[in-house]
Amino acid sequence: IVFDELNMIDEVKGAEFAIMSPVGYSGRNRTAKNARWLYGIAVDLDGVEMEQLRDVFHQMKHDFLPQCTYCVNSGHGLHLYYLFEKPVPLYRHLQDQLREFKYELIRKIWNRYTSTYTEREQVQYQGIFQGFRMVGTQSKLGKRYPVTAFETGERVTVEYLNGFLMDDSKAVTDFKYKSDLSLAEAKKKYPESVSYTH
């Protein structure tokens, strides 16, 4: 379990198997019910050889695909991380919308130029809670080949990613980002809206 201090991340370096998703939870269990914040979207792209890797970045450079924040080498494939400028709340009504949004993004990213897996049934659609091997841990290739991350872009917004969807009906628009206001600032700015607990 990783808490806000993130100190557990250093402790898993070199571990044989440790996964994490870009989701913040309340409570000790990693369940949809306990999910509070989505910090980004991680897309698993398999069947990537040098030709496909070049094409992934070519498509990003020419705005056919969204520019990822981090590209992670996971052994036989890539994990493309699109970290958000601000976390998105994981209200229950948004979870299904965000899953469909991610599926549509995967459909765009996983194409005949970015993967050797060219059949639609070979595409792997993972939900928003899917965890992947952590950077610094062992890849499927063993301890001599740790999972490695490369910073490839800036943090993104949901609105930016919406612009790359092939089906506009999958765009996520009805939500508010996490506020930068502290509780004290919110009470001062919105005294009638912020409830006080004693």
Regions found by a protein language model. Give the residues of each.
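Conserved small/polar residues in nucleotide/adenosyl-binding loops
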Residues: 197-198
